[in-house]
């Protein structure tokens, strides 16, 4: 578990470093890069959805995000300690909302996508309030920002997390967790079904 969490922290740091070192010219290039960056924000918050899919316990997304942020901070970060930890806790909370509504009983692709959607909306609003204060909500840039966050949330934090979870579970690494055993059991059931 700790190795996965640390890997998420390193991934966050690498993506953040890449996004800060790009140089762009021209208004169209800036808007395109702005949308691309916001879609890629899903890399920062996919860990919450993945944590809930694997651990299936209340608070797991918040815990994993906070520990991942601690790993990112150890490697070095240009943001303040409080900014990062507050953001990580909010992302974890919103990643857990759809699963909490079902009392942590439904774990499937639509739930993962809904989790990514909630986190994308949360992070989009968070950035508008704390990082992009000069951007009007209904300006082209504000609309592009929110749409990009939602798309990134659904695709990266939702769909990517689901298929990553399935791929990891099929290796047998997660057999000590109920989530891993469920995937392996479903695979065995499909293997024994006769062909019609």
Model-predicted regions and their roles:
Residues 26-30, 104-196:
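Membrane-embedded alpha-helical hairpins and interfacial helices in multi-pass inner-membrane proteins
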Residues 69-97, 130:
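Interfacial aromatic-anchored transmembrane helix boundaries in multi-pass membrane proteins
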